[in-house]
């Protein structure tokens, strides 16, 4: 079973859409194996998004991700990484497919509700960034 990391970003939390987003995620067949609410410091957000450090949006991304609480989730499903990317939609909600999480709930490319790992390799790294092995509950169903 494959795992991926999702982060319900500060705009999702501020707009009180945590439940709606998790409902969409679970309805798509994902199992939540770890979840917590946290607030990233600028340093922690910068470390998590270090891969984007040279990109022009890096500073804004770090500011945004440290602007309020967020909810990291470790999700499990066959083909989890690719399926979750499909479920959340394009980074820019204006370009996202109908019915995707970003199309339904996001306001802009910068505040787009949710993060999803972009590869199986990055999913492993990202899950480890937020969760210990002990925090991940094996799916017993």
Curated annotation (Swiss-Prot):
Catalytic activity: a 2'-deoxyribonucleoside 5'-diphosphate + ATP = a 2'-deoxyribonucleoside 5'-triphosphate + ADP; a ribonucleoside 5'-diphosphate + ATP = a ribonucleoside 5'-triphosphate + ADP
Gene: ndk
Enzyme class: transferase
Gene Ontology CC annotation, any one: cytoplasm
Location, primary (coarse class): cytoplasm
EC number(s) recorded for this UniProt protein: 2.7.4.6
Free-text function comment from the UniProt entry: Major role in the synthesis of nucleoside triphosphates other than ATP. The ATP gamma phosphate is transferred to the NDP beta phosphate via a ping-pong mechanism, using a phosphorylated active-site intermediate.
HAMAP family (alphabetical): NDP_kinase
Keyword field contains Phosphoprotein: yes
Subcellular location: Cytoplasm
Listed PANTHER family: NUCLEOSIDE DIPHOSPHATE KINASE (PTHR46161), NUCLEOSIDE DIPHOSPHATE KINASE DDB_G0292928-RELATED (PTHR46161:SF3)
Active site: 115
An MF annotation (GO) of this entry: ATP binding
Domain of life: Bacteria
Record key words, sorted: ATP-binding, Cytoplasm, Kinase, Magnesium, Metal-binding, Nucleotide metabolism, Nucleotide-binding, Phosphoprotein, Transferase
Requisite cofactors: Mg(2+)
Gene Ontology terms: biological process: CTP biosynthetic process; GTP biosynthetic process; UTP biosynthetic process
Designated name of the protein: Nucleoside diphosphate kinase
Entry similarity comment: Belongs to the NDK family.
Binding site for ATP: 9, 57, 85, 91, 102, 112
Quaternary data: Homotetramer.
PROSITE patterns: NDPK, NDPK_LIKE
